[in-house]
């Protein structure tokens, strides 16, 4: 039950202020008992704590940040606005409600039925120095998780607690989002 003072290892659930949280602590070696930061069993952990969407949010975008010698970790973004604000300058967001954007996200709705839309592309520098435009986010930078901490990596539409439908491509790239009227 955790109050015996024994070191915890592997996956474990810890009760903090009446709420249960899932953790992963290293099992062996010099880091035995240390909280894992990174991926384990298709889920991500920050300082041992499972990165998952809150029950009210249902789905949340997670940003991986790695600033040399300063910060490294996974940060949940509160909502679609925070997600767009966190995108680096190499990303582009088209928010025009037009048929091309509905098609880009695979939405079979009438334009009048869409209240808000965002289609995400990014510039990627090729080895020869040319710039290629790719659809969606880099999965090493941004990914979508559900309330159990599972990374959404299949082609799907996932509605968060604010009625934003996040569109994810096979492989986990976030292509954008939309809100229906």
Show where each model-derived region lies.
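Extracellular adhesion/carbohydrate-binding repeat motifs centered on closely spaced tryptophans
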Residues: 1-181
């Amino acid at each position: 039950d955790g109050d015996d003072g024994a070191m915890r290892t592997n996956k474990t659930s810890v009760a903090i202020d009446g709420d249960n949280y899932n953790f992963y602590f290293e099992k062996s070696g010099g880091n035995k008992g240390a909280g894992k930061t990174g991926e384990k069993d298709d889920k991500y952990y920050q300082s041992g704590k499972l990165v998952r969407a809150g029950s009210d949010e249902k789905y949340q975008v997670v940003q991986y940040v790695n600033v040399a010698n300063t910060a490294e970790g996974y940060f949940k973004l509160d909502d679609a606005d925070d997600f767009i604000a966190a995108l680096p300058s190499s990303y582009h967001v088209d928010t025009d409600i037009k048929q091309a954007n509905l098609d880009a996200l695979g939405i079979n709705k009438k334009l009048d039925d869409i209240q808000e839309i965002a289609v995400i592309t990014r510039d990627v520098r090729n080895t020869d120095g040319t710039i290629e435009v790719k659809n969606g986010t880099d999965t090493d930078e941004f990914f979508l998780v559900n309330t159990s901490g599972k990374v959404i990596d299949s082609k799907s539409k996932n509605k968060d607690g604010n009625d934003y439908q996040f569109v994810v491509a096979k492989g986990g790239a976030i292509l954008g989002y939309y809100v229906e009227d």
